[in-house]
Amino acid sequence: MEETLSIIKYKPLEGCEDQFEEELQKLYEINKDSGFADKATVKFTKLDDGSFIQIMICPTMDVLIEEQDEGLAWLDSVDHLLQKDEHGSRTEAVTGFTFNWS
């Protein structure tokens, strides 16, 4: 079993931070209703620049993949609230397997 860590950064448009935070709360409720929150650790934080970070720690990559369609549907629903980079991406994200030295 390979624990998987995924970190996603969202940058709301200026003036949309509060509305986006409300939508993140809805995402958390979606995660609870689907059972994802029972299988994974999901945390959110807000940075000083107004960006939001979502951190997910899943017991396996499969757990993360199972939730992918729901997550992308949510992301599409908040597209109008997000800044996009020069390539049109709405997020900055990294995903990988965790490891330790014990």
Locate the predicted segments by residue:
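Short, low-order "capping/linker" segments at domain edges
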Residues: 94-102
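Short, surface-exposed ligand-recognition loops at beta-strand->loop->(often short) alpha-helix junctions
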Residues: 11-23
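Short tyrosine-centred short linear motifs in exposed loops/low-complexity segments
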Residues: 1, 14-16, 62
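Short, solvent-exposed loop/turn elements at beta->coil junctions and helix N-caps
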Residues: 41-45
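Absolute protein N-terminus
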Residues: 1-2, 102
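Active-site-flanking beta-strand signature of metal-NTP-handling nucleotidyl enzymes
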Residues: 3-11, 53-55
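An amphipathic, aromatic/His-enriched active-site/gating alpha helix that lines ligand/cofactor pockets
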Residues: 26, 30-40, 57-92
